[in-house]
Amino acid sequence: MEDLKTTDALSLPVVSDNGGIIEPELQLPQAIPTELENNEEENGTIQQSQSEEDSAENGKIYMDDTFLPSKSQVKETQDSPTTPSFVSPSAEIVLPRVNTKYEAEGTTRNAVSPRPLYSPRSIGSPRALLSPRFAGSSSPLSNGTPISMDSFRDSIDTASPFESVKEAVSKFGGITDWKAHRMKVLERRNFVEQELDKIQEEIPEYKKKSEMVEMSKMLAVEELESTKRLIEELKLNLEKAETEEQQAKQDSELAKLRVQEMEQGIADEASVASKAQLEVAQARHTSAISELESVKEELQTLQNEYDALVKEKDLAVKEAEEAVIASKEVERKVEELTIELIATKESLECAHSSHLEAEEHRIGAAMLRDQETHRWEKELKQAEEELQRLKQHLVSTKELQVKLEFASALLLDLKKELADHKESSKVKEETSETVVTNIEISLQEKTTDIQKAVASAKKELEEVNANVEKATSEVNCLKVASSSLRLEIDKEKSALDSLKQREGMASVTVASLEAEIDITRCEIALVKSKEKETREEMVELPKQLQQASQEADEAKSFAELAREELRKSQEEAEQAKAGASTMESRLFAAQKEIEAIKASERLALAAIKALQESESSSKENAVDSPRTVTLTIEEYYELSKRAHEAEEAANARVAAAVSEVGEAKETEKRSLEKLEEVNKEMVERKATLAGAMEKAEKAKEGKLGVEQELRKWREVSEKKRKNGSSHGKSIQGSKEKEAETSVSNETETNPIPQVNPVKKKKKLFPRFFMFLMKKKSHK
């Protein structure tokens, strides 16, 4: 057992969510009461940590790249108990004011006594205090309340630390092979480019296929229209055939009735068949006349439409000519506007160049003015310094004058004393001649010295006065020069103001020119749009003319077809009339033959009656009735044959029309099947085209992403290169500045080379420098 006496405690550092250490730090919270010593026996013994071992070097324990202080270092910290220390994981952790007592019950294998669980070294271990187990709770020692030591049991993390950063990064999955990643990116980029090239190569093929499909679709549509026209024509022919069949049936029925009536011996006036035949012929005639009138009306409407189309064609031609003339005028205006635009651009460029020249001149004048003002300021400062020196010299000369006056006054006093002494010592002249001579010699020497000093002082005063006069004259000259410089500066300022005004005027003119250019551009855009519209209209005009001509041709063809149908109907009507006339003539001939036969029969009957009367009353076996009509077998066969031929012809026409209708239906089915196949192919090709376009878009997106990555990489590399070049330039600039400062120092220390002036205004400065050099040499 050992006693643990602490006045301060350690607080746990901030722990991240994943249990890692962010910043381990040691603070000095409130003091823990000394009741821990009394409660030590109640809390029981504390298990010792057998995993920790000392390094036996300077009393420090190395654990996880950290070490703890020895006893002497711990005692040294008692002088400053209030200063908190923030310790990083790789620095030394110094515990504040911890007194420990060690028992000598045993030693470890390193000949160091075993440490208890909560010795300063175990408490100071970051692996012990900063374990992830303590992430959710605060330190038990930070509240300042007496807490049992059993709460710290089983909380030491003795895992081996990370040996390197690479191991720590690889443990959390943060290590990557950037070279392999770049190679993968390059391979992916190459693959995307290859896919894009393939898709771009496939796009024209798919376009050709789509064009072929559209052409086939157009052909199928044309075939469908042609088949529809054929079907309509066949329907018309079928209707005509049906009408002809009905007419033939009616004719055959009427012929049969007439034959029956003729067999029955019915007269022409009382025959129903002849009346019905006449009514049918009249109805057909009226229908033909009505059809003729309708066809004439249709022809008249078609003629009117044709005339209207011709008028529209003439109007379209006139409009096209007017549009051509307007387009030529627009082109001429566009050419004039382009010439004006070129001229305005040239004037704008000239104004811009003059503006740049004026700006350069202004900048150069400003630089020269600044340089001149800087030089004049330096020279004025130097002149002021020289004036100060001359003033000091004048003060010293005045002091010398005062001293000279004082010496002359002393000399006069001495002379007076000498005269008094001579008067008083006339008796003792003989004895004091030698003394007087010596005194006179000494006085003469003094007077000569004083006179020499006075003469030298006078000379110096004269020189100082001359120097002062020269300095005042030079100062006046400098003032005149400064006033002239100020006048020049004012002139330059006025020139700058005028230049600024000109620049403002130039900017206004430039803005107006830009506005005019914008207006001209807008007008040009409008003219171009109008040109495009006129060109489109010009392109559409021949199409419209072609359509009008096609419509006119169609109308002509329709009129011709109507005329042909009318002619056919007229021919059929004439044929029907001719057939009716032939039938009437035949009927009339048959009636006459019947009358002749009747007459012959009557004569034969009369003869037979006479013979019967004359002969014995023999019965007549072969007496024909007066109402019966006798026909020869040949005539009967001919009539039956004609009726049968008419029926066969009508049946043949009906069969041909039915076969044509069936063929038309079959062709329509085929065209519909072709259309369905073409539509299916179109859908499939559209799907393939959409897939190809999606692939192309994806490839473009990938390419854009790769290009963005390349741009970012280039920007980063350019920034690095620019930073390196700017660093080099800054070094060169500092060297150049040092060289310039050294040159300026040399020029300041050696002002003699500046004697050769560049301008006439600097003639005053060599005199001033010569005066300074003379003064220095005199001193």
UniProtKB/Swiss-Prot annotation:
> Which controlled-vocabulary keywords does the entry list?
Coiled coil, Phosphoprotein
Q: Where is the composition biased (Polar residues)?
A: 79-88, 741-753
Modification Phosphoserine occurs at: S139
According to the lineage, what is the superkingdom? Eukaryota
Q: Name one Pfam family in it.
A: WEMBL
Where along the chain is composition biased (Low complexity)?
Answer: 650-661
Q: Any keyword tRNA-binding?
A: no
Residues forming coiled coils = 182-503, 532-587, 657-715
Query: Per the record, which residues fall in region Disordered?
Result: 1-119, 650-674, 694-759
Ranges annotated as biased composition (Basic and acidic residues) = 662-674, 694-718
PANTHER family cross-referenced by the UniProt entry: HEAVY CHAIN, PUTATIVE, EXPRESSED-RELATED-RELATED, PROTEIN WEAK CHLOROPLAST MOVEMENT UNDER BLUE LIGHT-LIKE 1
Family the entry assigns = Belongs to the WEB family.
Q: What is this protein called?
A: Protein WEAK CHLOROPLAST MOVEMENT UNDER BLUE LIGHT-like 1
Task: List the source organism.
Answer: Arabidopsis thaliana
